[in-house]
A protein has these predicted regions:
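Glycoside hydrolase catalytic-domain context in secreted enzymes
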Residues: 19-501
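Bacterial Sec-dependent N-terminal signal peptides
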Residues: 1-22
Length: 501
């Protein structure tokens, strides 16, 4: 009996320290957890929360058992795993995922329930991969169709964007995965995106460009927001005092963490006092080679800590930033209600199909050609490079490594029967390259066009599948379209094909 009493006493004593650690108690009020954690942290530990420790993670506090934040792109699915310190693919064999429809497609459904379904499904994929934060969705306004990243946003209407963004965020965060709403704010072009200074009237600012963000803050209570590269009133938006401290945090009463876009931080004092909470992806201006990964040289790292220690910047500033990051950690990676999630489930594929079908926009059907009656056609010709191209490849941060891709040509051959469907490429689009255009031989373009026109003469039905293809200066990050025309001579090709039908 004596031995049993000793064992019971030992168990009870072991539990005593945890009982006094409010920050580790998931049932305690969030602000109590945050305050308790802050009271136990050193200045250096607080600063460490505020900047990257790898390409897509920010630090926790290992001494206290506070976990790091794992972030990842992107708006339409979980990006393939990258190496810890580089942009190189880690070449995992188990990181293939479901590629969800574009957010423009989601917005075109005008269906809040589908937006909720989207947020639920995509957050389950992120959770299964061990991610705490979706770097998305995006709700910048499509001021011009030339915007290279328009497909990542929800169109040109602020009301529609606001209505559709809320269910996505609410459903994702109900699963314990933070949304990092982007890009705040006024980021509606890729050209000169690091240096353009946006001029906008107060009315347009509030009624158009900020409106969907405000709705996400006030209705969905989004947990994190990503700053944008551009400037407003001459100050970079990732640390713009008026935009972040006065509008977002004071006027809208937002308590989340403001994350910089990768490389969007430019100044320690502005980052400290201008509302930035987590600095990601900064290049260290030659202080070290990028290959050495000088995370301690980030603007909100050692330079910021020195300003705290010498009294130049108040400890209150540091505590506010650290508190915002801790809230995000406790809401996500240290939230026992965060789902385990799933990857490439049939439910997720069904969600993609439902959203994709409802997001289709028919522009014209004057001859009632659609829906196609397969029994009417014996010789079907499919034309277009996009009939065989996977549009999950390329596009910058939205690029995906999808497990299951069905090309339009494959689907049409299944619908009509392989023996009835012929294919002509029609034009060559080249490789999807992030920062340059893959030049195509004009002679090759002429040969491909001639082949398609020749085959069209014998076809009962020609189906053209074209458009943009994730190439630079099309629908791709870091560049905008140069015209409204379809690239690679597609307009001319379509006109020739129409004459043959």
């Amino acid at each position: 009996m004596k031995n049993k009493l000793i064992i019971i006493s030992a168990i009870a004593l072991a539990a005593l320290p945890c009982a006094g650690q409010t920050y580790l108690n998931p049932d305690a009020p969030l602000e109590d957890r945050v305050s308790d954690a802050l009271s136990r942290m050193t200045t250096h530990e607080k600063v460490a929360l505020l900047h990257a420790q790898s390409k897509f993670t920010s630090a926790g506090v290992p001494r206290l058992g506070i976990r790091q934040l794992n972030m990842d792109d992107g708006p339409h699915g979980v990006r393939e795993e990258l190496e810890w310190n580089t942009w190189n693919a880690a070449r995992w064999t188990n990181d293939s995922i479901v590629a969800f429809p574009s957010l423009t497609c989601l917005a075109a459904t005008w269906n809040r329930d589908l937006s909720s379904l989207y947020g639920k499904a995509i957050s389950e994929e992120f959770a299964f991969r061990g991610k705490d934060m979706i770097l998305g969705p995006g709700c910048n306004i499509a001021r011009t169709p030339l915007n290279g990243r328009a497909f990542e946003y929800m169109g040109e209407d602020p009301f529609l964007a606001g209505e559709m963004i809320v269910p996505y965020i609410s459903a994702a965060q109900a699963n314990g995965v933070a949304c990092c709403l982007k890009h705040f704010a006024l980021n509606d072009q890729e050209t000169d995106r690091f240096s353009v200074n946006v001029n906008v009237s107060e009315r347009a600012l509030n009624e158009i460009y900020l409106a969907p963000f405000r709705r996400a803050v006030e209705k969905a209570h989004v947990w994190s927001i990503m700053g944008s590269y551009n400037l407003w009133k001459g100050v970079h938006c990732c640390h713009n005092d008026e935009l972040l401290n006065k509008i977002l945090k004071r006027d809208w009463h937002w308590d989340g963490a403001l994350v910089s876009d990768w490389g969007g931080t430019t100044n320690t004092m502005e980052a400290a006092l201008g509302g930035l909470d987590i600095e990601m992806g900064t290049y260290t201006d030659g202080k070290v080679k990028e290959s050495q990964f000088g995370y301690n040289l980030y603007y909100l790292a050692d330079p910021f800590e020195r300003l705290i220690n010498d009294g130049t910047i108040s400890m209150d500033v540091l505590n506010d930033k650290a508190a915002r990051v801790l809230r995000t950690i406790f809401r996500t990676t240290m939230n026992p209600k965060k789902v385990i999630g799933s990857q490439c489930s049939e439910a997720h594929y069904d969600a993609c199909l439902q959203i994709g079908e409802e997001g289709i926009v028919m522009l014209k059907n004057s001859r009632r050609t659609l829906p196609l009656r397969t029994e009417r056609y014996k010789r079907v010709l499919v034309v277009g490079d996009n009939a065989t191209r996977s549009l999950t490849k390329g596009g910058g941060s939205s690029e995906l490594k999808s497990l299951r891709d069905i090309t339009p040509l494959e689907a049409l051959r299944k619908l009509f029967g392989s023996d009835k469907v012929d294919y002509a490429q029609g034009y060559e689009a080249g490789q999807a390259i992030y920062d340059k255009v893959d030049e195509v031989d004009p002679a090759l373009q002429e040969r491909l066009k001639a082949e398609a026109i020749s085959k069209a003469k014998d076809a009962d039905l020609v189906i053209f599948i074209g458009g943009l293809n994730k190439n630079h200066r099309q629908d791709c990050e870091n560049g905008d379209r140069e015209s409204y025309d379809l690239p690679y001579g597609q307009n001319e090709l379509i006109a020739h094909l129409a004459k043959e039908q």
